[in-house]
Amino acid sequence: MADYITTNIRNIALIGHGSEGKTTLTEAMLYAAGLVDRQGRVEDGTTMTDFDPEETRRKCSISAATAPVDWNGKIINVVDVPGYFDFVGEMIGPLRVVETAVIVVDAVGGLSVGAEKAWDYAGAHGLGRMFIINQMDRDHADFDKISSQLRAKYGNCVVPILLPLGKGPTFRGVVNVLDRKAYEGAYKKSVEVPMPENMKGQLMECYSYLIEQAAAADEELMEKYFETGELTFEEIKAGFRKGMKDGSIVPVVAVSAATGVGIARMLDLMAKYFPSPAHNGLYWAGKDPRTGEDITRICKDDQPFSAFVYKTIADPFVGKLSLFRIFSGMLSGQTTLYNPGKDKTEKCGGIYILRGKKQVVKESLHAGDIGAMAKLQYTSTGDTLCDPANPVIYPPIEYPKPCISKAVYAAKQGEEDKVFSGLQRLMEEDPSVTLSKDPETMETLLSGQGEMHLDVIRSKLASKFGANCVLKDPKIPYRETIRKTVKVQGRHKKQTGGHGQFGDVWIEFSPVTDGSTDIVFEDAVVGGVVPRNFIPSVEKGLRECMVHGVLAGYPMVSVKAKLYDGSYHPVDSSEMAFKTAARIAYKKGCADANPVLLEPIMHVEVIVSDDYMGDVMGDMNKRRGRIIGMEQCEGGQKIIAEAPLSEMFKYATDLRSMTQAWGRFTMTFERYEEVPADVAKKVIASADKVVDDDE
């Protein structure tokens, strides 16, 4: 593989909605460049970037994969990113290491929620953008309609650059607005042809869009354009390059990844006009780990080395691969690597370029390039590697919070260590997955971005590490309390031949009404009817019992127990006897005090477009939720509601289905409320009640 200096590097991420042809587009680019003998198909499991067995089985991308494409003396580092929202974590990392986001849009369906979110993510990372209207060979493909939709949505920055010749089955070539030439044919067989008469009007209209935006990208060009109404071809190209870099020009191109039409001309645009890492200047901002001061690094070979690890591949057979982007300096096998976040020095175990799963050995890489290193001992995704003499640390990747959790158990008893060590390895690959221990239920929770996401983790655990796990809905941390005041005696008497056991207490159980969930104990004994040294045993017995309620074994809350009377035996009374008497009083008293079941109520905020308001609100009502209010917000309407946790476990998946993936939500604990009688009956019937033996 050739050696490419910084100015000849182009780093791009293919992003957008799922099933709109990003992986097929990557294959077409590789085939056009002569890097594969035949173009793979997602349906057949033969693509270079969908190499994971899970991707082959599911016929969709679930991990970001790189595919460097050599084209006209440039290297285009393509990062093929999954489009489904369950795998959004795989998009966040690559966007940190590219200059341009290429958003793929379907030529029939048009702008999708995945494309809109991709636009927002790219903008948040300050990237240049381009739209590819793919699948122009399909029936009902309509470039004019989709490009007009994009201009209406995002403004005049959107400029059609490659116009289609024909559409649907007759799509045979493209018109390049920039050089005002027409081309027919697929892949490298794309050749110049005379400009069709019926395209000249559309060409000049789009050319005028291009001139205006090229002029707007540069103040000097704008002044000349206002004065003369013209720009030279070289000036237009310069304005186009600058507009691509700062986002003031967003080209739109027509291609068919399946047939290869438009692919070569699209690659020409990327090679000629996409920004290289050198164009970003003082772009990479970090901090000095020793002082906390801000540091910038210029993406040049003569700068101190620094790199950012954006992805990790954990393989049980070949070990760990760390995928990185060089932000400054050069990397060779002799480069000393320092991880400032871990304060560790790493030994480079080999430098590679990855094309799918294929590893190409490299002696060195230039500033701005993307590569991989093997067997880094301490380094994880989001870490910085740098020159130890010139340390810098870049901001870590901020992954979206998990929106679904499942309790995870080993499928076979005794394999717990195998399961959880495997999950830890998979979390190195995918930091958007988390493991946590619920202190209430003591379950281990596996959390991620959706049901498919967690199912993929479960499948990978089995295929990669031979560990099988079971995923279940988490237990609900119900509570129990009482609604009325009762007075009850707890009397424990047992004669066994020697010293007996005797304890006698009268306790008043009442609800706590000040909003506190505490268990309150009050000593109201007078006259020594219960000796002072036994009163702590009564309190201890009550508190131990109240860990398990009388209805379904859930902890009691908001209960006051007042010890106000009792009796004792000078010989047979003991701490244990009074502790047992307190337990008897608790069971008798709370059972008669109108015990009720409480459930956690969550504060939920859902953001949706106006089109889906009715469906979302109706669904919330079906979940026993209450709509508290609505607010106008960026991106649509915010619905504020409260709903029981038990009804919200699959809400992330259901909301995506209801809103065509437009909706998003946040959820936090609010308070406990009484469970409706019909629901409580089912919970109590299915609960594993704790059986206490008073003996």
Language-model segments: residues:
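Structural and coupling elements of P-loop NTPases
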Residues: M1-E695
